[in-house]
């Protein structure tokens, strides 16, 4: 199969290359997915670049030779291990694990979910790390409730765009912080108010919030 592989740390344009490699094997609890879309988030970049430098020993321990980077995918189930009960060949799935930047990826059963019919593969592939980070921050850690005032910095980024929508769906009054070029986009995904940080110091205002997601 074709895959993007990485042999050393560095800028992605210098260290990533497309190669033909053997397809991944699957264990009894694994699912083999034909990858239809894979997204890139900031964690992928840091793992590829080996940044910050102090983390390189850990990254090296996690990395095999000619590592296939990437974590978030959406695709179609090709095969399942004998202990897998939640999926069968032909199912459309999405999830987050490792080895995403390839034509096929082997994911543990628990790292996948069925793709909603109303999402494209491209849309579903973007939900893994970023959407779960936003959900865990707001629902699990922040305990966001209807009627609360929520401030989200970095509201136009990967985590921020999901956070705005999750907070709004929870019934919160949402204020997003972003740059000028993204004001309309953040408004379009549900923010009740948008602060352009290039024009206003949002830390100096008198507004008070029940929950702040400093993203």
Spans of model-derived segments:
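Residues that mark the start of a beta-strand
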Residues: 2, 30-32, 149
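Glycine-rich beta-strand-centered segment in the early N-terminal region that forms part
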Residues: 22-39, 53-99
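Short Gly/aromatic-enriched secondary-structure transition segments
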Residues: 45-55
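NAD(P)H dinucleotide-binding glycine-rich loop of Rossmann-like/cofactor-binding domains
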Residues: 46, 62-74, 79, 92-154, ...
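N-terminal Rossmann-like NAD(P) cofactor-binding module of classical short-chain dehydrogenase/reductase
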Residues: 94, 212-213
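Mid-domain Rossmann-like dinucleotide-binding core that forms the NAD(H)/NADP(H) cofactor-binding site
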Residues: 125-199
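Redox-cofactor binding/interface segments in oxidoreductases and associated redox assembly factors
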Residues: 196, 213-215
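A short acidic, Gly/Pro-enriched loop at the edge of an enzyme's catalytic core
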Residues: 204-211
């Amino acid at each position: 199969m074709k895959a993007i592989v990485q042999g050393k740390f560095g800028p992605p344009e210098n260290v990533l290359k497309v190669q033909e490699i053997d397809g991944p094997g699957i264990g009894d609890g694994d699912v083999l997915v034909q990858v239809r879309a894979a997204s890139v988030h900031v964690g992928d970049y840091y793992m590829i670049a080996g940044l910050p430098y102090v983390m390189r020993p850990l990254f090296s321990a996690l990395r095999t030779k000619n590592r296939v980077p990437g974590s978030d995918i959406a695709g179609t189930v090709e095969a399942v291990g004998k202990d897998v009960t939640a999926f069968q060949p032909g199912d459309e799935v999405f999830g987050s694990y490792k080895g995403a930047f390839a034509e096929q990826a082997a994911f543990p059963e628990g790292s996948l979910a069925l793709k909603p019919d109303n999402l494209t593969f491209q849309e579903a592939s973007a939900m893994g790390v970023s959407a779960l980070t936003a959900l865990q921050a707001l629902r699990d850690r922040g305990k966001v409730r209807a009627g609360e005032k929520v401030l989200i910095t970095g509201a136009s980024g990967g985590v921020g765009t999901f956070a705005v929508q999750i907070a709004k769906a929870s019934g919160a009054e949402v204020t997003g912080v972003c740059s000028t070029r993204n004001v309309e986009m953040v408004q379009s995904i549900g923010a009740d108010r948008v602060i352009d940080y290039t024009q206003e110091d949002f830390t100096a205002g008198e507004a008070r919030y029940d929950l702040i997601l400093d993203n």
